[in-house]
Amino acid sequence: MPEEALIGQMATYHEELAQAGVLLDASGLQSSAKGWRIRYAGGKRIVSDGPFAETKELIAGYTIIQVKSREEALAWAKRFPNPAGEAKDAEIEVRQLFELDDFGPSEAVDRFRDLGAGPRT
């Protein structure tokens, strides 16, 4: 669990995202002890219950924003609180989501559109 000070910093940051109208979703992830993995092997799906061996690279949460440019996303990302706590080494990863328009027209894409899937416009 993150310390109270970090939770406060994260709350402030996410409030700023919401006030700017760019926050779509955000949440922390519980320990892998409460999760599972599914491995695909040929036609089989093999379920492994957590906990999993801790790795150096751990996804502990996510924040999804919708902005107009890479530069705007980078500016927000640089303001993200250090997830390990100030003065400690840490790293966050920023990636762009696919939008349905990134795919060519198809019946499958239309089915996702009908679900209302994808970022809000």
Enumerate the language-model features and the residues they cover.
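Conserved, structured core segments of small domains
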Residues: 1-121
